Amino acid sequence: FLPDAMVNYLLRLGWSHGDEEIISREDAIAWFGLDRVGKAPARFDMDKLADINSHYLRAMDDGELWALVAPLVTPTSPNAEERVTKLMPLLKERAKTHKHIAAAAGFLVHDGAPEIREDAAGLLDENAVTNLHKLLGDLPEGPWEAETLQTFLKDWLAENGLKMKDIGLPLRAALTGTKQSPSIVDVMAALGPEEAADRIRKTCKI
């Protein structure tokens, strides 16, 4: 847990300032008074602490947050920091701690085909591989941005008589090894055209 989040939570265990839940150290110093110290015994609530921690995570600078995440993921790609910080605003949306971010960012910090998790392996059946092979041959040149990729995929699906369900989850599995990740176009933009194409080729053995 982040130090400021822990201080905030411990402070609120026995003291309050109206309905304020998020209290910075500066505000705590300015507002603190013994008249608002509670008499009832406090109960340590890990879920509440995690909620407060998530607030501080979202407010934290992405570069500073990467410095906390990096030791937990042992990156091997020279592009790891760039990829993770590019997706950091999305990665920290649902994270409660920086360990959650590290777990979600694992596919970004190494190059090459990701390790496919057991629950995602079934997404890469013969039909999915055929569709990914088609997509691979039509991928636009870089640089990639999420907005332009969204338009490309929409048009590509229409041209090939497919729906997003036919390509979305298989593509996510090929690029991340998982069934869950930030938006697939954001993932593609973070990886870039060369790395994304390489992962599709290696994962699908094309």
Where are these regions (language model features)?
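Charged substrate- and nucleic-acid-binding regions of tRNA-handling and nucleotidyl-transfer enzymes
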Residues: P143-I206
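Alpha-helical recognition segments enriched in aromatics with Gly/Pro capping
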Residues: F1-Y56, T151, P170-L175, K179, ...
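Residue-level detector of well-ordered alpha-helical segments, enriched
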Residues: A5, K48, L65, R83-L87, ...
